A protein has these predicted regions:
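Membrane-interface helix/helix-cap signal primarily in integral membrane proteins
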Residues: 1-153, 457-462, 471, 503, ...
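Non-globular, low-confidence helical/coil segments that flank catalytic cores
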Residues: 39-40, 44, 48-53, 64, ...
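Short, cationic motifs built from Arg/Lys/His that form the positively charged side of catalytic pockets
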Residues: 108, 204-207, 220, 484, ...
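Hydrophobic alpha-helical segments of integral membrane proteins
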Residues: 96, 100-119, 126-127, 134, ...
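Aromatic-rich juxtamembrane segments at the membrane interface
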Residues: 74-206, 213, 424, 551-556, ...
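Feature for secretory/organellar precursors and membrane-associated catalytic proteins
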Residues: 2-4, 247, 428
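Hydrophobic alpha-helical transmembrane segments in multi-pass membrane proteins
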Residues: 81, 139-301, 315, 362-418, ...
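Short hydrophobic/aromatic residue motifs in ordered secondary structure
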Residues: 59-60, 161-164, 200, 250, ...
Length: 664
């Protein structure tokens, strides 16, 4: 169990029947609890009874974006749910050792909670992040500064932290392998692993230390890559999905980088600088691929930050040990710890360069990322060195070709057709967001939005960068309601949007591509509302996308009143044909106040798309769904299908791609 924030707890539970039998093939579940928990450490390894609806986490809604379901799989969690209440059902373990184990774990978790409560607010976030990987105490701006500087790894308990503490242990014990020293080492590794929730990087570091010590005891040579491979195999055998986690990938990639690159760097470089440079070389393209950003100061910033962390971690751990054991020593050490925390933050902030320490980049192709890393590791290997010395160029080229073929194969296995579609109805939650592209140009209509969540920064920007879009040529808004306009405004604050327009009226035509067969026609309204801030749904802009012979009607939040008024206007001009469309973006998220029967009869779509997310409004309305299905219209929804893509295939019709497959 770990605290997520001030108002919410997350509990990882293992499911059993009421008689204490573990459910067959039952995965772990992650439960969210929104009430206060007194003495939460008592829940560690306790049995609880609860009633909750458990479900599967949804896969990613948009292509090449964060996949929460995959993240949970990497942690060996398959189910999620929300707790309203629970009761402790404590049962004693069968053996004394298991009882002792459980009580010691609870003691550690208790100390961590109480330790956090006694820290000063200005240093709590950094200390809990660096020491235990608990970033919930840090504000988002501080975390972003660490990310931009390439120093965020100090906020996730990693091999760096375990290595620092292991190095301190070696100095204190003079690297002895006597029984008491080994017992002390085992206790330390278990304790720190428990406090850091056994993150993949912690598990990797702990197991590699165990192998190193075992090698000394058995008088066997320790090889870093062999140990790394063995640990990797053990973790994959335990949970094959662990490879989906970025923490796992970065941890093992960082060690591979040190193993391959550090030995080819100039010998004059200090070990700490050589390791930092090797890790940066190995992770730069991976970070661009995974996080769509490249730090310009990472190498320079890591030198002082890692140096200070080398002193900060032992001091923080010493402070934690004295907490609750010797209050006087704790009180004497705390001022030094606070001062070092402020110094570490000051040094890190100094490298942000006013927000210019990192640049956003579009996601490089997967095949290029794999080929770059595989080729670089091969070029730095002893095998390649021997082949070069023997002038066996054909074998070198053959190895590189094999790496390239493997990279291309991986690219093929992860291919997503929706990434290349002409029109994508982006999953922005409860809101509208439509991405159009043609001839290298990109147009965005609406952009979702929520007062509780930055859709522009956290949804739209990762979507565009992850799918190779570095700028938006034109952004249009049907109207200024939050769930259409706010996300677009947030995007424009930290992403290049060349031009924005809102309040378009009937008769306006927009050509955003050199292709003469692609244009956007505005059909409604005839006049703008007097007060744009109070504009009603019946007067929002309505667009008809003409795309190489196909037509897509985009209605924003147009309600029944607006639909019938627009219909009457075009009927009066004998131009109802202008309303006919192959695809209808259903108005107002499928609300019962939209999609009038007469309107649907005139538009006569074959495909309908409802942009809707989890909501309390009853969207989409069952009546609207019934009207559409009664007319033989194929219905696609963002809340069910995730992002929805349209590929116009000329005489072959329209291909619809979705991120998720709907349940049968």
């Amino acid at each position: 169990m770990r605290e997520k924030d001030a108002e919410c707890y997350t509990l990882r539970v293992r499911l059993y029947t009421m008689d204490g039998t573990r459910l067959k093939d039952s995965p772990d579940a992650l439960l969210t609890y929104y009430q206060e928990v007194k003495q939460p450490w008592k829940l560690q390894r306790s049995r609880i009874t609860f009633s909750a609806a458990l479900g599967l986490p949804q896969p990613a809604g948009n292509p090449h974006c964060f996949d929460y379901a995959d993240y949970l799989k990497s942690c060996d969690i398959r189910l999620i749910g929300t707790l309203t209440s629970f009761q402790l059902a404590e049962t004693e373990e069968n053996s004394f050792a298991s009882q002792l184990w459980r009580r010691y774990e609870r003691f550690l978790i208790r100390q961590k909670f109480l330790f956090a409560e006694n820290l000063k607010p200005e240093s709590k976030g950094l200390l809990m992040g660096v020491l235990f990987g608990e970033t919930a105490y840090l504000d988002e701006d501080a975390i972003q500064q660490f990310r931009d500087n390439g120093t965020a790894h100090i906020l996730a308990v990693s091999g760096l932290h375990v290595g620092i503490l292991y190095g301190l242990y070696q100095r204190l014990t003079r690297n002895r392998t006597s029984a008491p020293c080994l017992a002390l080492l085992g206790l330390f590794l278990f304790s720190y692993g428990t406090l850091s929730a056994w993150s993949p990087s912690t598990v990797r570091a702990v197991l590699m230390i165990v192998m190193s010590v075992a090698g000394r005891l058995l008088d066997l040579r320790y090889d870093m890559l062999t140990a790394l491979s063995a640990v990797c195999l053990l973790l994959i055998l335990d949970n094959p999905d662990v490879i989906l986690g970025t923490a796992f990938q970065m941890s093992f990639l960082a060690i591979c980088s040190i193993a391959f690159f550090e030995k080819i760097l100039p010998k004059q470089l200090p070990d700490s600088l050589a390791s930092a440079l090797a890790v940066n070389l190995g992770l730069i393209l991976y970070q661009a691929y995974q996080f769509h950003t490249v730090s310009l100061v990472s190498l320079v910033a890591n030198i002082p930050v890692i140096y200070l962390t080398g002193y900060f971690v032992p001091l923080a751990m010493l402070c934690f040990l004295f907490f609750g054991i010797c209050g006087e020593l704790y009180a004497q050490i705390t001022p030094f710890l606070d001062a070092m925390a402020r110094l570490l933050l000051f040094v890190n902030n100094g490298f942000t360069l006013g927000g210019a320490s990192a640049v956003d980049v579009t996601r490089p192709p997967l095949w290029l990322t794999i080929f770059f890393l595989g080729g670089a590791f091969f070029a730095a290997s002893e095998t390649c060195l021997l082949l070069r010395l023997r002038k066996k160029r054909k074998q070198i080229c053959g190895c590189l070709l094999l790496i390239l073929l493997l990279a291309l194969g991986m690219q093929g296995l992860t291919y997503s057709p929706i990434t290349h579609d002409d029109v994508i109805f982006v999953d922005v939650g409860q809101g509208d967001g439509i991405h159009l592209r043609c001839g290298g140009k990109n147009l965005l209509i609406d952009g979702g939005g929520s007062i509780r969540y930055d859709v522009g920064q956290k949804t739209l920007k990762p979507y565009f960068l992850g799918n190779g879009v570095s700028s938006i040529d034109l952004a249009l808004a049907t109207h200024r309601h939050t769930d259409h306009y706010l996300g677009q405004s947030q995007l424009a604050e930290n992403f290049r949007v060349r031009k924005r327009q809102v309040g378009l009226m009937a008769g306006m035509t927009i050509r955003f591509s050199k292709d003469e067969n692609v244009w956007l026609e505005t059909l409604w309204p005839l006049t703008l509302a007097e007060d744009p801030q109070q504009e009603e749904n019946h007067s929002c802009s309505v667009f008809m996308l003409h795309y190489r012979g196909y037509r897509v009607l985009i209605t924003g939040d147009l309600d029944e009143e607006g639909e019938l008024a627009m219909l009457a206007y075009y009927q009066g001009r004998n131009e109802t044909e202008r309303l006919r469309a192959d695809v209808l973006k259903v108005g107002h998220h499928g609300s019962k106040t939209s999609s009038a029967a007469a309107f649907l009869d005139v538009v006569n779509p074959r495909i309908a798309v409802i942009q809707v997310g989890k909501n309390n409004y009853g969207h989409p309305s069952p009546e609207v769904l019934e009207r559409l299905t009664a007319r033989g219209v194929q219905v696609f929804r963002n809340d069910v299908h995730g992002a929805i893509g349209l590929q116009f295939q000329g005489k072959n019709g329209i291909r619809v791609d979705t991120m998720r497959k709907a349940a049968a």
